[in-house]
From Swiss-Prot:
Expressed by the venom gland. Keywords: Calcium, Hydrolase, Lipid degradation, Lipid metabolism, Secreted. GO terms for biological process: lipid catabolic process. PLA2 catalyzes the calcium-dependent hydrolysis of the 2-acyl groups in 3-sn-phosphoglycerides. The keyword Lipid metabolism applies. This is Acidic phospholipase A2 4. It catalyses: a 1,2-diacyl-sn-glycero-3-phosphocholine + H2O = a 1-acyl-sn-glycero-3-phosphocholine + a fatty acid + H(+). The keyword NADP does not apply. Its EC number is 3.1.1.4. Hemolytic and neurotoxic activities are not detected. It comes from Trimeresurus stejnegeri. Its cofactor is Ca(2+).
Length: 24
């Protein structure tokens, strides 16, 4: 599921302090 994948990315990115997913 793409939705779950995006949530996973946000969780990992937030933990790492990355905000590259904010472009979505």
């Amino acid at each position: 599921n793409l939705m779950q994948f995006e949530l996973l990315i946000m969780k990992v990115a937030g933990r790492s302090g990355i905000v590259w997913y904010s472009d979505y």
